[in-house]
Amino acid sequence: MPPAAHGAPFSLHRVGEVLILQLESDDGMNRLTRARVMALIDVLNQITTDPEPLIITGSRKFFSVGADLEEIVALTAPAAYEFSRLGQQLMDAVARFPAPVCAAICGYCMGGGLDLALACHYRIVSPDAIFGHRGAALGLITGWGGTQRLSRLIGKASALQMFVAAEKIGAQYALESGLVDQVAEDPLQAALRLVRDRHTLA
């Protein structure tokens, strides 16, 4: 298991046979900056060579609020295209990971953070989890595959409502609509049980 460097935008540790990748930032909001996206791609490429069940999680109040808008608006057109490709590369690395991947989500899961959660094979969330994609309200639309993945999970009409109207939804509606697999008081512990069970059955 590759160690996370000091000051890295995430930590990586093991609980038994399960790897836990925890997004970290000083403000706890876990923005998906270009540097963070590249670091996540690198670590996923490393652990794919000897895959074990993986949980991706964040802080108590934020899974991730998505891209850093200040960084986004400063991008040139070529740089924006490159960032879009990097985001797609990250989501594909998660979706194609050869062992079970579960997002353990507390609090806000927004924008690119929602894209990341959608790329995971399973999603277990706290009762206070909130989901949304506010890009359309800011004149932006995700280029990271979230539109397609969300449509497959909850249907085109509901996905359009979330993306075009920038509508936020809570944990219970997310469960009823099929966006998430389970609501739990302790998403991390529930995720540990789930990926262990799925890995045993694989």
PLM feature segments, named:
Residues 1-57, 92:
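Conserved CoA-thioester-binding segment of acyl-CoA-metabolizing enzymes
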Residues 7, 16-19, 27, 83, ...:
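Catalytic cores of nucleotide-enabled group-transfer and carboxylate-activating enzymes in metabolic
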Residues 50, 58-90, 109, 137-139:
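Glycine- (often His-adjacent) and acidic-residue-rich active-site loop
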Residues 56, 68, 116-117, 174:
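Hydrophobic/aromatic residues within transmembrane alpha-helices
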Residues 57, 104-105, 134:
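Structural motif
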Residues 90, 110-163, 191:
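CoA-thioester-processing core
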Residues 98-108:
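A short, small-residue-rich loop immediately preceding and capping a beta-strand
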Residues 124-129, 171, 176-202:
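C-terminal long alpha-helix characteristic of the crotonase
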